[in-house]
Amino acid sequence: MATAIVRSALSRAVTRAAPKTSVAPKRNFSSSAGHDDAYEAAKWEKITYLGIASCTALAVYVLSKGHHHGEDPPAYPHMHIRNKEFPWGPDGLFEVKHNKEH
C-alpha cells in the first residue's frame, strides 16, 4: 500500500513538472497544406484590395454625376379648396401667412 502511495505521488509530481503543450496537433490531409493556406490568404487579400479600389471608383463616378430632379407637380385647382374656415384663421397652420395664391 505504501508503494502505491509513493508511486502515485511520483507520477503526480512528474506530470506537474512536465512542460505542458497547449498547441493541439494539426491534422494535415495533404502534404502541401501550409503552402495552400498561404496561397489562399494572399489570393483573398488581393481580391479584397481590388474590391475596395473598384467600389471606391464606382462611388466616385456615381456621386460625381448630377441627378435629374423631377418636375414640379401641376397646380391643380382642387388642391386648396376650403369650404370651411379654420378655427385659427384663413391660413393653414403650415402655410405662409398672407399668401395671395391660395
UniProtKB/Swiss-Prot annotation:
KW Acyltransferase (keyword) present: no
Highest taxon listed in the record's lineage: Eukaryota
Compartments it resides in: Mitochondrion inner membrane
Keywords per UniProt: Membrane, Mitochondrion, Mitochondrion inner membrane, Transit peptide
The keyword Membrane is assigned to this record: yes
Record SUPFAM superfamilies: Mitochondrial cytochrome c oxidase subunit VIa (SSF81411)
InterPro entries in UniProt: Cyt_c_oxidase_su6a, Cyt_c_oxidase_su6a_sf
Gene Ontology CC annotations of this record: mitochondrial inner membrane; mitochondrion
Regions annotated as coiled coil: none
Span of the transit peptide along the chain: 1-36
Function description: This protein is one of the nuclear-coded polypeptide chains of cytochrome c oxidase, the terminal oxidase in mitochondrial electron transport.
Family from the record: Belongs to the cytochrome c oxidase subunit 6A (TC 3.D.4.11) family.
Name of the featured protein: Cytochrome c oxidase subunit 6a, mitochondrial
Species the sequence originates in: Arabidopsis thaliana
The organism's taxonomic lineage, starting at the top: Eukaryota, Viridiplantae, Streptophyta, Embryophyta, Tracheophyta
